[in-house]
């Protein structure tokens, strides 16, 4: 027994330790349950959150607006973000950065960089010598990359979300344009890393919009495919997307709605910003014409004036969307000269005529990539702020040939809502209704490599090969494996973009490098030397195009295989037990597939032999993993494996699902079948087949990024530190401003209070003069030296003033509380006295309170009355300017003491059982009164209210209870006058108590 106890103690300690760890994890998880999304537009961003109790809500910024400008102002000692930075664009346009997302992932010679310089000449862009990208130079000491500026914006968006959610947030889904390539997507991920955000996914903004549309129309989606076109014209670009909605059967959740991106078309520079720039140029021309002959400078040479004109152009574009003409006016545009000019919608449309001609372009691209016609499109829905321009809607309606354009979606917030729904689905803290999302690859990716071939005996040459890895408009996320079968030494291969013929010449120049990565493999020859007796199954490279659309090379392996013959005696008991357990939890995978870490290899289909003449060139060495993504929908059963895979006789379906248990498969070891029956005699006579053993050797990989090198880790660490220092400086600035505002507010409020009657009654003239003089001195100091004062100095000044005014404020506050507190005390004393008087009137036989308890209550009541009268009398003698002796906290203490005594007696009366009356000498109780009715004599005992147990009637000693059930098994019913007929009949059937039974 002692040994058993000793064994149980460690187990109990271990259990408690596990419980503590789980509770700690739950508490930590509850602190970070909220997730957020950032719809990152060119001009503004929308932030949404999901947290327990708050489903999918748009975050309001500090100005209570639902969208925030993507603007940053950087100065030597301060930084502004959002609306504050937008206001600084007029005062300091050089330090105010906008539309910097157009520079992400671009090198200095990119046409987009030159376009940015022409649009915003006030910004100084310098070349980063390490990456050949550009940096903003505010001053020689202030230089920031576009990724760093974007990191500031993302960090600001998180602070807005955390203030709104009232809890920390670290997980986010960020929207990016669908046309972003690999370099641009990696730049956004690096910016999020600088901001300390964990990116759950980079979701395309068109996909997020389509998801938001589908989530709120889930009931309208059925097995019939519905094709919807979304035309999104924002500030910086235009994207047209064709989406197919229908319900599909999934492995995890059965029939669920799905959206599939079928076609995408885009124009990188067509948007509201270009329209505003055209209007700005028109207004600048009008202003110069108005000042012609005054020998004035060109307004285009004044950055502040151009910033004012751009703001007015933005307003004009909005107003002209609803009005035929409008008057543009700016006070003090330049050199204190006001500007005023009339602009009509016709003039605006003439300025942007070539832009409106480009509106149908993305529609045609989307239809072409989807291989659809306009007749197959059921609805065209407008998204984005620039689609509110009437001419855009007119041209688009003519291009699509529909009766009307759909406007049944929030054009500004749809992407943010769809992204936050995806964030909740990806987070482990929420459970949402499944909605399958199948995004599409915009730019195809292929693998290129060179190998030696022998065309003629003795004549060898190099052959260049291309294999498509991810095809255009193919779904992602997706994993692919490519097998190189004819290499036994180290070699290189290249990852590049595929055919980009669908892009125009200008788009190709903006796209940048079409070469992604060069992969150098090391250790291939050593792996062949390590397994000389094994047959090579090729060099397998595993690729992953993740949910964010970012390509990565997971690993490269050299796979070998041989035939091994095992006798039944070679398998030990432990091995059999291990195989059995593995089959139970792993879906019945055979033991030979578990050796040397070959699980992932066994789950993949073998690719056909390299260079097969009877197959297309693109498929000679490419294969896709058999294991689909988690949200992959059910597909038709795969075709019969060929080549080596067919010889293995494996069944990929069984290995994927793991639904077929080990016992249901043919037993290869000659053991009993699932019912325990002996194997068939024919099987016993067959020789045991040899099993295949696979060996996997990891191959070293050296990557050379060709499109745009990522920031080195040391540079990234410096950028993170730079942003943290800026954030800390902003927090210190906010703390200082808060302290200064508190000090200034205290001075003004106290100066006003000194003239109020209730403050003058409790203070002398000398006291008020002392306080007033100190307040005036502090106010003067704040005006003269407050700008250079630190946060500590401001807080010390405030603490000094509060200490000086503490006595005055205390006296006023106490006098405000006296009437309410004294009235409550009087009521409690009166009720307590009445309660005590009633308690003393209770007959001695029924008394539940002892004399000591009642005496104690009486003493407390008397002491409280005496304290109140004495304190009031003493307070009346004191002048109002002195510290009062009647304190509100003392009154509350007296009330609590008295209430505690009363509550004790009330609870005792509530739960005390009545005592039985004493019996007479002959063993009977006193006769009932003569005026008592027969019904009263026959009345049975009813338990008192609040009593937990039912009272039992007292029986005579010589009588016994009849019946098989206890006397208190049923509630007692009232018999006699006043009882119902049913109660009378029930009472008559029971034994009537004698006189001695009555209480």
UniProtKB/Swiss-Prot annotation:
Keywords of this protein's UniProt record, alphabetized?
Acetylation, ATP-binding, Chaperone, Endoplasmic reticulum, Glycoprotein, Nucleotide-binding, Phosphoprotein, Signal, Stress response
The Gene Ontology terms for molecular function here are: ATP binding; ATP-dependent protein folding chaperone
- GO BP, sorted A to Z: cellular response to hypoxia; endoplasmic reticulum to Golgi vesicle-mediated transport; negative regulation of apoptotic process; negative regulation of endoplasmic reticulum stress-induced neuron intrinsic apoptotic signaling pathway; negative regulation of hypoxia-induced intrinsic apoptotic signaling pathway; response to endoplasmic reticulum stress; response to ischemia
Q: Where is this motif: Prevents secretion from ER?
A: 996-999
Query: Where are the annotated segments for Disordered?
Result: 567-694, 909-999
Show the ranges annotated as biased composition (Low complexity). 669-680
Compositional bias, Polar residues, is annotated for 574-583
What is its subcellular localisation? Answer: Endoplasmic reticulum lumen
Q: One Gene Ontology cellular component annotation?
A: mitochondrion
Q: Which residues carry this modification: N6-acetyllysine?
A: 883
Major place of localization? Answer: endoplasmic reticulum
Which positions bear Phosphoserine?
A: 567
Which Pfam family is an annotated match for this chain, by its short name? HSP70
Annotated glycan sites: 155, 222, 515, 596, 830, 862, 869, 922, 931
Instruction: Report the leader peptide range.
Output: 1-32
Instruction: Name the CDD domains on file.
Output: ASKHA_NBD_HSP70_HYOU1
Per its UniProt record, what InterPro entries does this chain match?
Answer: ATPase_NBD, Heat_shock_70_CS, HSP70_C_sf, HSP70_peptide-bd_sf, Hsp_70_fam
- UniProt feature, compositional bias: Basic and acidic residues: 611-626, 641-668, 949-962
Q: What does this protein do?
A: Has a pivotal role in cytoprotective cellular mechanisms triggered by oxygen deprivation. Promotes HSPA5/BiP-mediated ATP nucleotide exchange and thereby activates the unfolded protein response (UPR) pathway in the presence of endoplasmic reticulum stress. May play a role as a molecular chaperone and participate in protein folding.
Q: Quaternary structure?
A: Part of a large chaperone multiprotein complex comprising DNAJB11, HSP90B1, HSPA5, HYOU, PDIA2, PDIA4, PDIA6, PPIB, SDF2L1, UGGT1 and very small amounts of ERP29, but not, or at very low levels, CALR nor CANX.
Similarity-based family: Belongs to the heat shock protein 70 family.
This protein's name: Hypoxia up-regulated protein 1
Gene encoding the protein: Hyou1
